[in-house]
Amino acid sequence: MKFSEMPYARPDLDAVKQQFADLLARFKAAATYAEAHAVFLEEEKLNKHVDTLAQLASVRNTIDTRDKFYDEEMNFWNEATPQLQECQNAWSRAMLDSPFRADFTAEYGDLMFVNAEIADKAFSPDILDEMAQENKLTTEYGKLIASAQIPFEGGVYTLSQLSPFKNDPDDARRLAAWKAEGAWYKEHGAEFDGLYDQLVHLRDTMGKKLGYEGYTTLGYYRMGRNCYTKADVEKFRAAVVKYIVPLADSIYREQAGRLGKQYPMNAADNALMFRSGNPRPAGDADAILKQGKKFYEELSPETGVFFNKMLDDQLMDVLSTPGKAGGGYCTSLGDYEMPFIFANFNGTQHDVEVVTHEAGHAFAAYMNRDRIPYSYVWPLSLIHI
């Protein structure tokens, strides 16, 4: 099914919560593993369906943040998601306490329980209001970024559309583009500062309500960190300072030499890799996707089938357009067992990187599309290393 044909309707939140509650009661009352397993699969299906609706609303909202319908839907999901998280937390708690835990482990592995224990540490009904407010603030941030209309050389550009000028080999033009972007950020500085300040205090409150020193520990739990700790990250940071910073310093010094610039360089000069200009795609968006199709077909039968399915079902929105949210991402549409790629092509090397980076995420999700539990589709320990 093509993305544009996928139906969306706001779910009845109270009815969905009741469905989760009924499944929870049946799960707790199960007398055998077979009974518990059957309810488990029902809960998986419901969870996947609700998540699909949420993702459809989110994707369509980010494609055009000016769309009034999906703007209202995001307001709904910002309030609904924490309440649904409460349902999920109750389910995870029941799974952890289940007399059939060993049976589930034998069939699906122990990772689902490791993750459930972490998720349990990241939630409490006491922070429902803060979670809803957090969603609202992050949505406001996305809309603010998407609203950028930056005048430059007689045109008006979004942040993404301005990027080619910020990489221009002409020093004066490149610097002017950076200044134009900086002027827009400065103009909206109070709004950005307000959102940041509110989020910092909000998340600090959430962490303290859960009994932590602040947000850091809660942040680790929310990210599902199941294979390394804060201490490990501190060691990694020390290694970055010791090994990577000197290497990066030498690379930037070489770059300054190529450009004939004094080191350290300013932000505008940092953006230019070669005096002749940065690498750029040889074609437009259609040409890039055509080459991506050729690449994935030659890579393996599986990647070929995957990428052609993405193209046929219009599961990529890559053009940079007014009102579109910034950046790029990949997500899953569970009911359809397919991923979706969101990007902002702007004529820079970033366009080609998206076809490998986000498509890499998408292929991983595609290969995991029928995994149980549904949370295994996106293993946070492996999505970004």
Each model region followed by its residue ranges:
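A well-structured
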Residues: 1-278
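Auxiliary, metal-adjacent structural segments of Zn-dependent hydrolase domains
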Residues: 258, 276-336, 348-349
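Short beta-alpha connecting loops at secondary-structure transitions
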Residues: 340-344, 371-380
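Short pre-active-site segment immediately N-terminal to the catalytic Zn-binding motif
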Residues: 340-355
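Catalytic Zn2+-binding segment of zinc metalloproteases
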Residues: 360-373
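Conserved small/polar residues in nucleotide/adenosyl-binding loops
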Residues: 383-385
